[in-house]
Amino acid sequence: MGKISSLPTQLFKCCFCDFLKVKMHTVSSSHLFYLALCLLTFPSPATAGPETLCGAELVDALQFVCGDRGFYFNKPTGYGSSSRRAPQTGIVDECCFRSCDLRRLEMYCAPLKPAKSARSVRAQRHTDMPKAQKEVHLKNASRGSAGNKNYRM
């Protein structure tokens, strides 16, 4: 019984081995060499280095990284720890002419703005204006020596 149940398994192994032998003979060693060379020359995403960003691509990347904070094209004053006055480099020098990564882009983001108080200037009504400012406004309006010309400020 043991020989009958293992017979299909043996036939499968034999046919599969013969199939592999035929396929291996048709692939030459030069084909394998070129295949290995191609696989080694393709960079994988994990090993790909930082890229250069210029023009609109650089601005888009900065807007993506910095979000609502905004960004600077030059390093803010007081940036870095060197005491010497080196020529100031900007984001274009660092990311367009050379490659840069996300950390380098983040260095050019503006600092976070502090949260505004609950009662901001926009939240005030026009009637909340102090009387002194209203009086000055009325005095300026009564000086009609402008010859009926409207000036915008």
Curated annotation (Swiss-Prot):
Biased region (Basic and acidic residues) positions are 125-138
Question: Where in this protein does the record put region B?
Answer: 49-77
Question: Its domain of life?
Answer: Eukaryota
Task: Give Gene Ontology CC terms.
Answer: alphav-beta3 integrin-IGF-1-IGF1R complex; exocytic vesicle; extracellular space
Region C: start-end pairs: 78-89
Residue segments, region D: 111-118
Question: Where is it localised?
Answer: Secreted
Biased-composition ranges for Polar residues? 142-153
* Annotated keywords: Disulfide bond, Growth factor, Secreted, Signal
| UniProt similarity note | Belongs to the insulin family.
Subunit and interaction comment: Forms a ternary complex with IGFR1 and ITGAV:ITGB3. Forms a ternary complex with IGFR1 and ITGA6:ITGB4. Forms a ternary complex with IGFBP3 and ALS.
What is the protein's given name? Insulin-like growth factor 1
Query: Gene encoding this polypeptide?
Result: IGF1
